[in-house]
């Protein structure tokens, strides 16, 4: 072999090695860039389309089994179910199997089930609390079957009782439910959902008293009215900061009307006896600063836009804010 041939071959091998290293590094670099850009993922709460799923007068009806397809149609890959939409199907394996099949077919993850109408978790009577816990077990089982990570419950008690007594009772019910959730590897998350549960300090007190690793909070950006009749509202930014240490795998991005003139990332609720403006950018920054990087779920309840348009507008706001972080 001549010196020229040896040099050429060495040069080729060296160049090939360098090129190979560059090409191998590119996917990793792109992956890191994508991971850095996306501080959180976006999901869709079924309640955003509640008028259609519950077949309200004047609303074009939707079947619960269509939910995953709708989420995918607007570019969303995570869904949060509402038990009201399939209330009598909690133990129907064939039906749940069809839900699971459709979600998988759309490439959509089933994240949680929001549970209402199953009793008061903080009922003053021992028997009533026990019954409420029992009533939620079928939803824990359904969530497990669907591949969800959580069920969302309400920390309701008797409003006539003292603050501390309500907290004690709610914590007792939640602890019991947390024990059941732990057997299934699931979370039980409480939403700030009106009354005392919308008071940040009260709900944190409940979490401390419940004292179970499987019990946490699902913060809702818009549910901070402690008394709508009196227009009494807990500071949503303070409340969100107080809730974040207790958040597991879900945050609810409640949204109302967009493009109202308040600002690009402001959403406003102007229903009767309600006057609320939410700074989405500020709220999202609180969530991300707390180290949360999971799904943030769109829950649209506005009046100005159609349900689908409201979902799309909320998604756009979340994506634009995410790109800025």
What residue ranges belong to the model's regions?
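N-terminal secretory signal peptides and thylakoid transit peptides that target proteins
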Residues: 2-20
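Active-site acidic/histidine proton-transfer and metal-coordination neighborhood
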Residues: 16-27, 36, 68, 96, ...
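C-terminal segment of N-terminal export signals and the immediately downstream linker at the start
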Residues: 27-56
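Hydrophobic faces of well-ordered beta-strands that scaffold small-molecule active sites
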Residues: 40-46, 79-81, 110-115, 151-153, ...
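Acidic-and-aromatic substrate-binding clefts and catalytic sites of carbohydrate-active enzymes
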Residues: 51-52, 59, 82-95, 120-124, ...
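Short, acidic/polar
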Residues: 57-71, 130-141, 233-240, 280
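Catalytic domains of carbohydrate-active enzymes, especially glycoside hydrolases
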Residues: 63-82, 147
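Acidic/histidine-rich catalytic cores of soluble enzymes
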Residues: 78-79, 174-285
